[in-house]
C-alpha cells in the first residue's frame, strides 16, 4: 500500500525536506493499465466478479423454470456491456492529440513554479512542451495533458476526457442496470426461501434428493456443488446489501453527470465553480470582532426621517452620533471621531428646515395652534455674517479630543443603531431668497370701487408670494412712492366725510394675543404687512410716522379711529339703504 500512497508522477516542485530519488523517472501514464494500479481499480474488479459469480452461479439457477432464460439473457447482456465499456474506457489513451503525436515515453520534467505560475499558459503546456487545446488540462496523476479534461477516475485508474467520456458513462449505466437485476433476483430468492422453498428447487438435481430438503446445490447446472440450506439466504442477504450500496453510489454518479450535461459543464469546471463560490461565501462572512476598540461606522441606516433613496454612499460623509452629541462629559463629536466645533453646529442648525426650528422654539402646544391659525409660511434662509466663530472653544475641544477618544469610540460602537443624518440626502427644492431688498414690479392698475369702507380693503403694493427678506428691513423708495400715490387717489375718490377719518370695518375686530417671538421667527418672516401710514384731517396728505414699527403704527391708527367714532357720528347714519 505504500506504493499507492506515494505519487511519483508529481508536477509540483519537490520540497526542501523531501528526498528525490534520481533513479526513478517521472514518466507519463498511457492508460488505466499503466503502473501503478489504484486500490479502487482492484475493488471494482472484485465487485464485478462477485456479482457475476453469485448472479449466474447461485441465484439465476434457483429461479422457476420459465424465468431462467430471461434471467440469463438480461443479466448477461448488461454484464457483457459493462465489461466491454469498462475495458475500453480503461484502455484508451485520453491524451491530447499533440501529446499523443509526440513521444512521451521518456521522463517528464518537474514543474518549477518560480518560472511559471501555471502549467498551461496561452494553450501551451510547459511540461509536455506542446500546444494543447483550450479545454485540455494537465493531469497530475497521469502527468500528461488530457483533451477536454473532465476528471481522473480512480475506479478506472485513467483520466476521463473527450476520447473516453461516453465509454465511461455507458459503463456506469450498464453497471447500474446489472446490479439492479442481481439485487432483484437475490431478493426473490431470499423471500421464497422462507415462504415456499419448493419454488426454488425446480432443477433436476433437486429431484434426485427430493426427501432431503436440507441439501442445496449451487453453480447449477454445469458444476453442481452441495451446500447447506442456511448458506443460500446468507449469501442473498450479503448480495442485497452490497448491491444496494453500489446502486446508490452509481445512481448518484449518473445523476451528477446528467446534471453536468444539462448545464454543459465538466466535472473540473463544476469543482472550480464550487470552489469560487465557497471562497466568495467565506469572504462575505463578517470578520471577527476587533478587540482594539476601533469604532465601526455604519453609514447607511434604515430609520431615516427623510424621504427618498441614496444613490450612493460617500465613505467620507460625516454622520452624527447621538451619544457623542448628548454626552455631557466630553466634547461634541461626529460618529467618525472628528470634533464638531461650535460654528459647524450653528451652521447646521441654520441649514435645517424652519419646521424643526419652530418645534424647538415652541414647546407648548397652544402656541403651535396659534401659528397654524395664522397660516404663516416660512422658508429657510442663510444669514451670513451674524455668527462669530469661537476660536477659544474650538481649541479647547481639540485639546480634550485625544484624552477622551477611546470613550467616545466605545459609545459610537454601542450606538450604531441610533445614528442619524443631520441633513437630508437631497437639498430642498425651494430656492433661497436674495439678500437684497425686494422691489415692486410696478404700480398696479387703477382701483375703482364704491363699496370700499376702510383702508384695509384697498390693495397695496406687496412683494410677490414666496419672497423672503430679513425682518425689520426698510421699505424701498419705490414702495413708499406707490403708497403715497394710492393715498392721493383715495383722497379724490372718497367723500370728505370718509377722507377725514376711516370708517370702521363691518366685521368685528378681535384683539390677537401677542405671543413671544423667538429669535428664529424674528430673523425670518414674509413681507406681508400693511403700510404704516394714516390720514390727517388738517393736511389731507398721507403722513408716515418716522421710525415706527408696523405693529406700533397699526395700534396708533386703530386708537385714533376709535376716538373719532366716539366724537362724531358714523358716516353711515345718514346713508339711505337701496
Swiss-Prot record:
Residues 278-288 have a biased composition (Basic and acidic residues). The chain crosses the membrane at residues 42-62, 72-92, 175-195, 231-251. One of its GO terms (biological process) is positive regulation of NLRP3 inflammasome complex assembly. It is an enzyme of class 2 (transferase). Residues 278-298, 345-376, 497-517, 532-578 are annotated as: Disordered. Residues 121-173 form the DHHC domain. One of its GO terms (molecular function) is protein-cysteine S-palmitoyltransferase activity. GO terms for cellular component: endoplasmic reticulum; endoplasmic reticulum membrane; endosome membrane; Golgi apparatus. Residues 1-41, 93-174, 252-578 are cytoplasmic. The active site is at residue 153. It is a multi-pass membrane protein. It comes from the Eukaryota. It is found in: Endosome membrane; Endoplasmic reticulum membrane; Golgi apparatus. This is Palmitoyltransferase ZDHHC1. It comes from Danio rerio.
